[in-house]
Amino acid sequence: MITRRSWLKLMSLTLAGAPVIGSNGAANILRRNSFDSPLTLSPQNYYRYFTIFAEQERAVLGAQPQLPWQWFVDNIPFVDVPDKEIEQTYYFRWYSFQKHIRQTASGTVIDEFLDDVPWAGKFNSISAATGHHLREARWLRNQNHAESYAAFWFKPGSEPRRYSFWAADSVYAVYLATGNTVFMLKLFPKLIENYEAWECSNQDASGLFHQIDDRDVMEKSISGSGYRPSINSYMHGDAIAIARMASLANNPEVQRQYEDRKSVV
């Protein structure tokens, strides 16, 4: 029987993008949803959580929220957890997540705030949390949610560098879950351009990247601006991801360049 500790470890690593069961094994486990299998969980067994969430929302807002139950059935990975508090939290995350998915003229956007905020970009988009959003959206059965949102950031006016954002690492994480090489390689040149733009604006002769604390999504903090571990870890991760993409694209020159870059940061 799986323990609470081991389940938390598995789920944390899997949702964060670690290859805990090979490159696509974790994806296959979480995305398996063919209802003709006797081993498949029945979504109806978890419907009660969503009605509880909707009732709590109604109590706060004073209006009955829409409950798109079929969307959850069609999209989310259903899991059964021995600890029901963890299980309820898991399903609440999907309940709240779907509210942030917007369909726009530029494709799918997953916003950070339900209400429009003045510090956001077009369609209330904010690149700061996109890495987290893509790591969650990649588990949805409709791959377009993650892939369209990733592509959104490389369309005119989307400002992917308005905040620190591990773009290449996120796109590669989506690929690990979906196996869609075409999607990943289509964004490959844009991800290289994005990395080089960061080098021009935020890297100096030391090889390290500097960032303003607010733009690093840490608000105004005592640490202030400068060489921050966060932005440098993002760029290190992006260099690794681009090198791996280059390998899949049979581009040894770019692979070598970005393997060198990751060693500098």
What positions do the PLM features span?
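Conserved small/polar residues in nucleotide/adenosyl-binding loops
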Residues: 264-265
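Active-site lining segments of carbohydrate-active enzymes
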Residues: 106-132, 175, 184, 188-205, ...
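N-terminal secretory signal peptides and thylakoid transit peptides that target proteins
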Residues: 1-15
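C-terminal segment of N-terminal export signals and the immediately downstream linker at the start
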Residues: 21-40
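The feature captures the catalytic groove of carbohydrate-active enzymes
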Residues: 38-39, 44-58, 157-165, 199-259
